[in-house]
């Protein structure tokens, strides 16, 4: 079952007099439950592709369908609702709210969804336990290591069991041991909960864990490999 379908995507950014074509006629289908990495050099279009799948960037031309919804015909309010209920984001820089504790950061999405306080707290505790942060519920981001902050970010992304998690360079600021632990945790969630994970990455380890590796160059899809020997699959 397709959960993402991109057809002939084009995206151009303009910075002053400079025009950069980030995506060029890119087409890609992703099935529910995939664990997929998008690789390529800087400027190849990886982050742009994730942002467009997440409805954060407008499409110049082409079409994107996510979980049965055609993004280019949706209003900003409809896109925000899709992100809130169907898509989890993990950012390279964590993007945690510094004045909130770990558990409050995780609860925030559910607060926007209108869940009762007791249910929010129970779900947030459970998912923080799942990512190895039991007992650190009340720590603020500045009191956590980089690896712990990224685990809070993952917990926030998956607490509502989204259909898709989009992870932009999730291991870039982590040492190899912490990065491996994070990947194993997300791989387990993919297997157990059937959450679709889509990564953008330069990290060879992420590519090794992925069950499918898509490569971009100059905004074009240049390779698409399904792997039978991904790490710990």
Protein language model regions, located:
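H-loop (His-switch) and adjacent beta-strand-loop-beta switch element
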Residues: 213-226
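ABC family nucleotide-binding domain
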Residues: 2-216
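ABC-family P-loop ATPase nucleotide-binding domain
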Residues: 1-12, 223-233
């Amino acid at each position: 079952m397709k959960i993402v379908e991109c057809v002939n995507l084009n995206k151009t950014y303009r910075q002053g007099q400079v025009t950069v074509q980030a995506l060029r006629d890119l087409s890609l289908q992703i099935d529910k439950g995939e664990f997929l990495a998008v690789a390529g050099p800087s400027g190849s279009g990886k982050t742009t592709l994730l942002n467009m799948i997440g409805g954060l960037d407008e499409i110049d031309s082409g079409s994107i369908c996510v979980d049965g919804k055609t993004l280019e015909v949706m209003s900003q309010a409809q896109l925000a609702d899709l992100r809130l209920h169907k898509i989890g984001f993990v950012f390279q820089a964590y993007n945690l709210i510094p004045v909130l504790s770990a558990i409050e950061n995780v609860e925030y999405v559910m607060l926007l969804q209108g869940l009762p306080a007791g249910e929010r707290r129970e779900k947030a505790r459970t998912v923080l336990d799942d990512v190895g942060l039991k007992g650190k519920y009340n720590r603020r981001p500045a009191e956590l290591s980089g690896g712990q902050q990224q685990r809070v970010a993952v917990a926030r992304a998956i607490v509502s069991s989204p259909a898709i998690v989009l992870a932009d360079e999730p291991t870039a600021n982590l040492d190899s041991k912490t990065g491996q632990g994070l990947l194993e945790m997300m791989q387990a969630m993919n297997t157990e909960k059937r959450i679709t994970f889509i990564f953008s990455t330069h990290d060879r380890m992420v590519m090794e864990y992925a069950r499918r590796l898509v490569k971009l160059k100059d905004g074009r899809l240049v390779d698409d490999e399904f792997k039978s020997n991904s790490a710990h699959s």
